[in-house]
Amino acid sequence: MSVAPLNLPWATAERAQATSRVLGEPEWLLTERMDAFERLGRLPTEPNQLFTPYLDLRSVSFGAVTPIEPFASAEAGGEAGPEALPEGAAALISVGPDGRVHVSLGDTARAIGLVAWTFGDILATRPELVRPIIEAGRTVPEDDAFGQAARALASVGIFIHVPAGAALADPIVLRWTAGKAGKALLSRTVLSLGEAAQALVFEEQVGSDGSVGTGDAGSEAEAATAQWWGTTEIDLAAGAVLEFTGEQDFGPDTAAFASRRARLARDASVAWAIASVGGRLHRSRVDNELDGRGATVRQVEIGFGDGRQLFDLTSYTRHIGQDTTSDLLSKGVFTGRSRGYIKGMIEIARSAKGTDTFLGEFSMLLERTARSVTIPSLEIDQPDVRRAMHSSSVGPIDETQVFYLMSRGLSRDAARRAIVLGFLEPVVARIPLPAAQDRLRALLERKWPSGSRGQESGSPGGSRAA
């Protein structure tokens, strides 16, 4: 399965053409869709041979869903009133389970000239902002079948632009609601920051029925009944600074396929903090391309699985410019019969002198039935680097830490809980909205094994560092 193309019965040239026609897209964007469709037909599901043994899509039935139909006009989404803004947010872009888009901009966002709307509206008014960024597939990895599927068939397109020199201290909130049974929501989000612009983005993904994102529902043979596919395509001009945080809490019957990519010019920086707790299956791929000299990436991603959930967290970082820096950390906690595949690749091109990079992947198993693998990798074509290293481990909670906390008066369960939540806190602390921070902490608490389930777990993996 991993070397074969994705088998999507609903991914047809006719559907891509019809979607483009309904949305009234220009000819060049239809060409983009057809290019993605052609790529999708020949790409392997997993392009990296090192990772092919660790791809499992058995909990997804691609033929059991059909894509949500696009709206003929962006006016179907309308504009929410100012009261719709979450407290402390500069702007809100909300996408419902039927693909309807609502946008609300605060006074500060309007004052700095923030652009946030659908592809349709932007293409009708300021197409010069969009075309140079996405044309020729520049913002979607050419080897990512899941990203190309969204590029070909997206019925929802969101475009966000922060003008050069502008700075937003409060976050732009992008909220997705998904989980409509028998439906797949496919989307593209393009985020552009001009030179020396600064912004915070908080992406929130929740289930349409308000269900808690645990993996307890269903048996191993049952497939997710709803799907969410989405790209996040980030283009950072020279000196731009972006903080991107994400929280995924889809319902237990949803499979999610997230493809995110950032391209960084000279002295630009992006800080990722992504937490995933929901869904039946969650596949996340994050690509960073450090093109410009002095570009910097900081990335932290966590997943907490229970029941029969599967988290597939993959990152690719390519150092191309000189004196670039990346610090990448992925963490997983798994209980029940959940599984975690944490995979990463750092590539240092011959042109990337002075690179400083670290990749860390760590999994904690709370029960003997949970499983995880961590696969950090380096490809170095330039010996003149400041640092290039990786580290990984898979295992149970450190009993030395448990003993220490128990000696300070905590019960065994409380000690284990404190260690796990502290293990995940680096992402929680980065969430820019206090209410969202509290919600994520509550979700993580709720995932904790009840009773005495959280006992010492066996470890199918060891630890290694390079």
Region annotations inferred by a language model:
Residues 22, 104, 116-410, 424, ...:
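Conserved beta-strand/loop scaffold segments within soluble protein domains that form the structured core
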Residues 41-50, 423-433:
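Short arginine-rich
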